[in-house]
Amino acid sequence: MKNIRIDYYTGTGGSEWVARLLADKLKSDNRNVVVNRIYRANINDMETLETDYYILIFPVHSFCAPKPVYEWVEHLVGNHCKTAVISVSGGGNVITNTACRCKTVKLLKKSNFNVIYEEMVRMPNNWMKAPNKKNYTHILSKLPKKIDQIAQTVISEQRREKIIYWIDYLISALGEAEKGGTYKFGNGIKVLDACTGCGLCAKNCCSSNIQIERELHTKPKFGNQCDMCLGCVYNCPQKALQPTWGAFQVDKNGYNLRLMRQNVDDVAEEKSLC
């Protein structure tokens, strides 16, 4: 196995971080790795993948994969390559989450992918309440070892499947139904006067739901395709995007994964100097 393709969907950066770390680890073992971010705007004609191993990474939304992930998989044609499906969640592999990959795996198999490996990676929670420093330091300090384990499983082409609790099939089904209302979150975002029209929210919107004329520094306009990844709200440098529908699901103090990572690196450096 020489060639590996990693596709990932990310909102606030957790899945992207996992994808980049895993890619670096696999490259260090002399594998050819292509990394691609999933945007709804890039889902066009059917794409046939020619790779030795395929890895799909996504955050858990409502106990399932985000809608654009399903749309992405449905536009792919596999070559029966061995495949890993990796979900990312603040709760990790707990009850309510064990069936979060089921629909994605089913769609991949239908598209001629040989799914042999399923995994869950825990990252700091971004829903309702962001973790405190002690909590996210504990989570992120374990990430390198987890990435090493995943890389070794991929390289050795081992078959590993997760146990799924029967109640989670029902929970995931309810989560799928809940997604029908996520567009209301995007429609309900209020753009405050602090907005500079920088265009960062539109550039990074994985659902292609935000329109803005960056040259004119106009304020963003939200469509009806929001998947509630929370990326635009948390990543706005001016904190100028204020949710009105479902606002309780956003931590008013913000969520900054880069800052968390820097703090963890600083703690590690301090320990090494002791």
Per-range role (PLM):
Residues 8:
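A charged nuclease-like catalytic/ligand-binding cleft shared by nucleic-acid processing domains
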Residues 191, 196, 200-221, 231-248:
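Iron-sulfur cluster-binding cysteine motifs and their immediate structural context
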Residues 42-45:
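Short acidic active-site motifs
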